[in-house]
């Protein structure tokens, strides 16, 4: 049976429009209430920004054989046990017949600050995955096949995220591919290496300008970290687990 990719490109464009629209709506609401956060924070604290991407992921799961699985989106049901910490809160969990089928993180990064936030996102992504796989090794989820672990990042496409960045490393040289790399390129390299090191089943990064609130246009950085690769891998895993578990 062919995998159903649920017209993911159109749904991704809708998700991009919703992302920027929700940020602006949250910012305007806080301004009107007189409780506006400083700078870009207002658009973040409103939440809901990645809901369009969440809906896309849900469609992939339901279209490829696990519409009847436990698909958790509510905060109270999104924790998994960790190894280095008691629990970790995920953005989406899929559980079927007592097995963890998928755990997915949906992240975004909007300017003007890219430096510190990039480092924080990197450390979080690596730590989260290492914690989960160590817990898996210790049978925190029982004896079962490896779950799908996905990481999807939406980054603002802006001059600040595309310009070359210099690094200071006085004792030992930085890896060549990082020298002068923009933050978008660094996210692409991060996602590639998260997959190469088997920390995530697949990791994707897309970039979109604020003007995409009207068009939904977005850019992908490489085939390995593309949205199609993410969606295809998820659809394949879901279909395989649906067939295995019946």
UniProtKB/Swiss-Prot annotation:
GO terms for molecular function: DNA binding; type II site-specific deoxyribonuclease activity. Its EC number is 3.1.21.4. InterPro entries: Restrct_endonuc_II_XhoI. GO terms for biological process: DNA restriction-modification system. The keyword Iron-sulfur does not apply. Keywords: Endonuclease, Hydrolase, Magnesium, Nuclease, Plasmid, Restriction system. Its cofactor is Mg(2+). Disulfide bonds: none annotated. Pfam families: XhoI. It is an enzyme of class 3 (hydrolase). It catalyses: Endonucleolytic cleavage of DNA to give specific double-stranded fragments with terminal 5'-phosphates. Homodimer. Belongs to the XhoI type II restriction endonuclease family. This is Type II restriction enzyme PaeR7I. The lineage of its organism: Bacteria, Pseudomonadati, Pseudomonadota, Gammaproteobacteria, Pseudomonadales. The gene is paeR7IR.
């Amino acid at each position: 049976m062919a995998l159903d990719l649920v017209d993911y490109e159109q749904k991704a464009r809708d998700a991009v429009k919703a992302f920027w629209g929700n940020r602006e709506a949250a910012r305007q609401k806080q301004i009107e209430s007189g409780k506006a956060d400083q700078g870009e924070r207002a658009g973040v604290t409103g939440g809901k920004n990645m809901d369009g991407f969440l809906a896309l992921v849900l469609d992939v799961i339901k279209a490829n054989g696990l519409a009847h699985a436990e698909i958790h989106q509510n905060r109270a049901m999104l924790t998994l046990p960790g190894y280095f910490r008691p629990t970790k809160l995920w953005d989406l969990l899929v559980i079927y017949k007592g097995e963890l089928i998928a755990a997915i993180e949906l992240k975004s990064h909007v300017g003007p600050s890219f430096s510190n936030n990039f480092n924080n996102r990197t450390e979080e992504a690596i730590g989260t995955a290492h914690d989960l796989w160590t817990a898996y090794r210790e049978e925190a989820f029982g004896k079962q096949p490896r779950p799908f672990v996905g990481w999807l990042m939406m980054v603002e496409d802006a001059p600040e995220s595309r310009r070359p960045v210099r690094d200071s490393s006085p004792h030992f040289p930085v890896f060549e591919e990082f020298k002068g790399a923009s933050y978008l390129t660094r996210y692409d390299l991060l996602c590639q290496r998260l997959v190469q090191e088997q920390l995530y089943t697949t990791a994707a990064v897309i970039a979109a300008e604020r003007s995409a609130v009207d068009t939904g246009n977005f850019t992908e950085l490489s085939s390995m970290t593309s949205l199609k690769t993410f969606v295809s891998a998820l659809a394949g895993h879901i279909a395989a687990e649906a067939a295995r578990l019946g």
